[in-house]
């Protein structure tokens, strides 16, 4: 299915020109829609648990899923995970996350090398000393042999120490030395871009390379990616590393990525949230989708506008209805994206009183203005800007959801009656 992009009027900024990289059946960069990816946190060697989590992430909307490949057992598990996913009818590109020993694992487990859609390589720990160039070359040779793209992902938590020492020495010789943060950014960028250019020299085509350079500070990340985007034409993967738990992680990631996306920088994103105990891993996928949709880059599910509530809305009914409607349309999109293409661009409004309720509802495709405190117990519904019907009684929620479903059927059905 072709990913839906918001209307041109919602995305006035130009996208950065990059190479287009094919990762399985997904294309990243080259003007294609920004892709959502995620990562498992299971022991990859546990085939059952890993398959289950990949499936959950895919059902939530992840378009690529990365798995840790850190030992022989996890490398051997990758083909079995892919086989189980295929039996479930799930076709999602699997990305192998390699550190330290990827060259050896891919050589020892050719089935793993063949099944993976992309290899993630960390230039900071691909090898040390004299082994660095050798082991990096072996990874690139494997990518060439199997026709796989790579992501060269630098991270300030695992910097290339030799490169860092070199750039520190050069900085000390400057007449006006840079501050430490600026040198750190330069190390990250040189590590990623320099490794990519070396991969090209070794024979890997430019359109099989994605870059990332992650830090955990919002302003540092923005500065790194602005600079890196200006220095190369490789597709870029965005992510704030170790963003944190709960609302802090969501806010930090959104603050950084929204700025870069607004400037046309970024071809694929991941929201690196620390899950709370017992929380589903799928939250990072939902947040990534909502970020892309609220910034006008993609459309995944109908968006529900709802007021925050005030003294006029002492009843919790409008809050409950907004939550119910949001969950209803998200659940329905599993089917609607096939049978009713375009439904994901629909806007809904669930408002709590007469002040902004009718006006906001008119702006939506379909909206409802519920009665506030002291108002008449009626709820006018507006469809495409016009008042359509007034709902009353105890079944307002069910009646409104029925109107939403009817609207989707009439407007977006692929095969209308």
UniProtKB/Swiss-Prot annotation:
Specify the protein name.
Answer: 4-hydroxy-3-methylbut-2-en-1-yl diphosphate synthase (flavodoxin)
Which residue windows are transmembrane per the record?
none
The alphabetized UniProt keywords are: 4Fe-4S, Iron, Iron-sulfur, Isoprene biosynthesis, Metal-binding, Oxidoreductase
Return the cofactor note field: Binds 1 [4Fe-4S] cluster.
Family of the protein in this entry = Belongs to the IspG family.
Catalysed reaction equations from the record: (2E)-4-hydroxy-3-methylbut-2-enyl diphosphate + oxidized [flavodoxin] + H2O + 2 H(+) = 2-C-methyl-D-erythritol 2,4-cyclic diphosphate + reduced [flavodoxin]
Keyword Acetylation part of the UniProt annotation: no
Which domain of life does this protein belong to?
A: Bacteria
Q: Give a short account of what the protein does.
A: Converts 2C-methyl-D-erythritol 2,4-cyclodiphosphate (ME-2,4cPP) into 1-hydroxy-2-methyl-2-(E)-butenyl 4-diphosphate.
Q: Which cofactor does it need?
A: [4Fe-4S] cluster
InterPro entries, A to Z: Dihydropteroate_synth-like_sf (IPR011005), IspG_bac (IPR016425), IspG_bac-typ (IPR004588), NO2/SO3_Rdtase_4Fe4S_sf (IPR045854)
Give the enzyme's EC designation: 1.17.7.3
An example GO BP is: terpenoid biosynthetic process
Residues holding [4Fe-4S] cluster: 307, 310, 353, 360
Entry GO MF terms: 4 iron, 4 sulfur cluster binding; 4-hydroxy-3-methylbut-2-en-1-yl diphosphate synthase activity (ferredoxin); 4-hydroxy-3-methylbut-2-enyl-diphosphate synthase activity (flavodoxin); iron ion binding
Q: Which PANTHER family match?
A: 4-HYDROXY-3-METHYLBUT-2-EN-1-YL DIPHOSPHATE SYNTHASE, 4-HYDROXY-3-METHYLBUT-2-EN-1-YL DIPHOSPHATE SYNTHASE (FERREDOXIN), CHLOROPLASTIC
Pathway this chain belongs to? Isoprenoid biosynthesis; isopentenyl diphosphate biosynthesis via DXP pathway; isopentenyl diphosphate from 1-deoxy-D-xylulose 5-phosphate: step 5/6
- Supply the source organism for this entry: Xylella fastidiosa (strain 9a5c)
Q: Which Gene3D superfamilies match?
A: Dihydropteroate synthase-like, Sulfite Reductase Hemoprotein, domain 1
Which Pfam families did the record assign? GcpE
């Amino acid at each position: 299915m072709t990913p839906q992009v918001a209307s041109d009027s919602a995305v006035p900024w130009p996208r950065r020109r990059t190479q287009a990289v094919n990762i399985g059946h997904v294309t990243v960069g080259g003007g294609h829609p920004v892709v959502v990816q995620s990562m498992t946190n299971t022991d990859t060697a546990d085939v059952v648990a890993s398959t289950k989590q990949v499936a959950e992430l895919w059902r939530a909307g992840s378009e690529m899923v990365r798995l840790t490949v850190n030992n022989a057992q996890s490398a051997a598990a990758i083909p079995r995970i892919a086989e189980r996913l295929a039996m479930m009818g799930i076709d999602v590109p699997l990305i192998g996350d390699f550190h330290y020993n990827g060259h050896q694992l891919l050589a020892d487990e050719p089935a793993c090398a063949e099944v993976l859609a992309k290899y993630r390589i960390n230039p900071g720990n691909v090898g040390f000393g004299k082994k660095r160039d050798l082991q990096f070359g072996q990874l690139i040779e494997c990518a060439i042999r199997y026709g796989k793209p790579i992501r060269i992902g630098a991270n300030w938590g695992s910097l290339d120490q030799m490169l860092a020492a070199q750039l520190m020495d050069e900085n000390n010789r400057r007449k006006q030395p840079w501050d430490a943060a600026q040198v750190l950014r330069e190390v990250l960028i040189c590590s990623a871009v320099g490794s990519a250019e070396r991969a090209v020299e070794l024979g890997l085509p430019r359109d099989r390379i994605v870059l990332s350079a992650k830090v955990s500070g919002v302003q540092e990340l923005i500065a790194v990616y602005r600079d890196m985007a200006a220095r190369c034409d490789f597709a870029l993967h965005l992510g704030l590393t170790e963003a944190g738990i709960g609302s802090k992680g969501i806010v930090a990631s959104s603050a950084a990525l929204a700025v870069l996306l607004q400037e046309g920088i970024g071809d694929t994103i991941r929201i690196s949230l620390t899950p709370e105990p017992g929380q589903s891993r799928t939250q990072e996928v939902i947040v990534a989708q909502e970020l892309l949709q609220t910034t006008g880059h993609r459309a995944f599910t109908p968006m529900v506008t709802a007021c925050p509530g005030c003294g006029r809305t002492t009843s919790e009914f409008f809050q409950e209805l907004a939550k119910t409607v949001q969950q209803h349309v998200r659940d329905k999109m599993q089917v609607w994206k096939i049978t009713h293409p375009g439904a994901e661009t629909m806007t809904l409004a669930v408002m709590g009183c007469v002040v902004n309720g009718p006006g906001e509802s008119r702006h939506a495709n379909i909206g409802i203005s519920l009665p506030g405190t002291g108002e008449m117990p009626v709820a006018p519904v507006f469809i495409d800007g016009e008042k359509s019907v007034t709902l009353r009684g105890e079944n307002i929620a069910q009646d409104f959801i029925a109107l939403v479903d009817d609207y989707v059927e009439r407007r977006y059905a692929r095969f209308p009656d």
